[in-house]
UniProtKB/Swiss-Prot annotation:
Assembly notes: Homotetramer. Forms heterodimers with either ThiH or ThiS.
Chief location of this protein within or outside the cell: cytoplasm
Organism (species): Bacillus cereus (strain B4264)
Domain of life: Bacteria
Entry-linked Pfam families: ThiG
Active site: K96 (schiff-base intermediate with dxp)
Source lineage: Bacteria, Bacillati, Bacillota, Bacilli, Bacillales
Reactions this protein catalyses: [ThiS sulfur-carrier protein]-C-terminal-Gly-aminoethanethioate + 2-iminoacetate + 1-deoxy-D-xylulose 5-phosphate = [ThiS sulfur-carrier protein]-C-terminal Gly-Gly + 2-[(2R,5Z)-2-carboxy-4-methylthiazol-5(2H)-ylidene]ethyl phosphate + 2 H2O + H(+)
UniProt: 1-deoxy-D-xylulose 5-phosphate binding residues: G157, A183, G184, N205, T206
Cellular location(s): Cytoplasm
InterPro entries referenced in this protein's UniProt entry, alphabetically: Aldolase_TIM, Thiazole_synthase_ThiG, ThiG
Molecular-function GO terms, alphabetical: thiazole synthase activity
Pathway info: Cofactor biosynthesis; thiamine diphosphate biosynthesis
Protein name as catalogued: Thiazole synthase
EC number: 2.8.1.10
Length: 256
C-alpha cells in the first residue's frame, strides 16, 4: 500500500491528465492504468465555470483522489493562492507544490518550494512538494513535515529517465515519508528502475499522453511499476566482478 497522510492506495502509479489527444483516450488510459491518484494543473482549467470543458466533468471523480498542482507559480505566495483556489472548489486537501525557478529546465525553485511547503502545512494541507534530486533539500522538506517527497528523475517532459540514480537512492534511503519519483520518466524501463531503487511510487504524464498509443503505454507503466516494486521487495542479487556457476559442480561426474 502507498500511504500518503491519511490516505492509502493500492496503485503506486500517479497519473497526470494533461496533453492527451482527447477525453476518450484520456479516460481509457486512466482506466487501464488503474491509477487512483490523478493530478492536474489548477491554472489550466476553470474549476468554477461549469460551461468550460475540463477533466472533472468527464470523470467519475468519486473513483479517484484528485491531486491538484500549483504549476505556473513562480513564488511561494502564488503557490499558496493556487492551492487555496483548489481547496475552495471542494477538491482534495492534498496539493502538489510546484514552484518553477527556471523556465528553460523547469527545475523547481528550492527556496520558494521550502517556503510554500511550510506555509501550506500551516494551512492544514497535505503537502507533496515537487523537488530536484537535491538530497539536502529533500531532507529539509521532510523536516518541515511534508507528507511525501517528489524528486524529479530529469527535467519535466524530457523523457530522459533517471539521470542521477545515486542521488535518488540517497533521498530514498534517508526518507521517513513516501518518495514519489516525478518528472522525466520516458519509458516503462524508467518507471521500473525508479521502483527498483526503492521509490514508493511514480508520477508521470507525458510518457503516457505523448506515446504513439497512450492506452497501451498506460498499461505498460502500470505493469512496470508493479514489477519494479516486486523486484525491490524480492531483493536483487549482489553485483560481482567474476562469474558464479548457476549449476552446482559438487557431485558431478567427469567423463574422461
Amino acid at each position: 500500500m502507498l500511504n500518503i497522510g491519511p490516505f492509502s492506495f493500492h496503485s503506486r502509479l500517479l497519473l497526470g491528465t494533461g496533453k492527451f489527444p482527447d477525453f476518450d483516450v484520456q479516460q481509457k488510459a486512466i482506466d487501464v492504468s488503474e491509477a487512483e491518484i490523478l493530478t492536474f494543473a489548477v491554472r489550466r482549467m476553470d474549476i468554477f465555470d461549469a460551461k468550460q470543458p475540463n477533466l472533472l466533468e468527464k470523470l467519475d471523480v468519486k473513483k479517484y483522489t484528485l491531486l491538484p498542482n500549483t504549476a505556473g507559480a513562480k513564488n511561494a505566495e502564488e503557490a499558496v493562492r493556487i492551492a487555496k483556489l483548489a481547496k475552495a472548489s471542494g477538491l482534495c486537501d492534498m496539493i502538489k507544490v510546484e514552484v518553477i525557478g527556471d523556465d528553460r529546465t523547469l527545475l523547481p525553485d528550492p527556496v520558494e518550494t521550502l517556503k510554500a511547503s511550510e506555509m501550506l502545512l500551516e494551512e492544514g494541507f497535505i503537502v507533496l512538494p515537487y523537488t530536484s534530486d537535491d538530497v539536502v533539500l529533500a531532507r529539509k522538506l521532510q523536516e518541515l513535515g511534508v507528507h511525501a517527497i517528489m524528486p524529479g528523475a530529469s527535467p519535466i517532459g524530457s523523457g530522459l529517465g533517471i539521470v542521477n540514480p545515486l542521488n535518488l537512492s540517497f533521498i530514498i534511503e534517508q526518507a521517513t515519508v513516501p518518495v514519489i519519483v516525478d518528472a522525466g520518466i520516458g519509458s516503462p524501463a524508467d518507471a521500473a528502475f525508479a521502483m527498483e531503487l526503492g521509490a514508493d511510487g511514480v508520477l508521470l504524464n507525458t510518457a503516457v499522453s505523448g506515446a504513439k498509443d497512450p492506452i497501451k503505454m498506460a498499461q505498460a507503466m502500470k505493469l512496470s511499476i508493479e514489477a519494479g516494486r516486486l523486484g525491490f521487495e524480492a531483493g536483487r542479487i549482489a553485483r560481482k566482478r567474476c562469474a558464479t556457476a548457476s549449476s552446482p559442480l559438487e557431485g558431478m561426474s567427469v567423463v574422461e
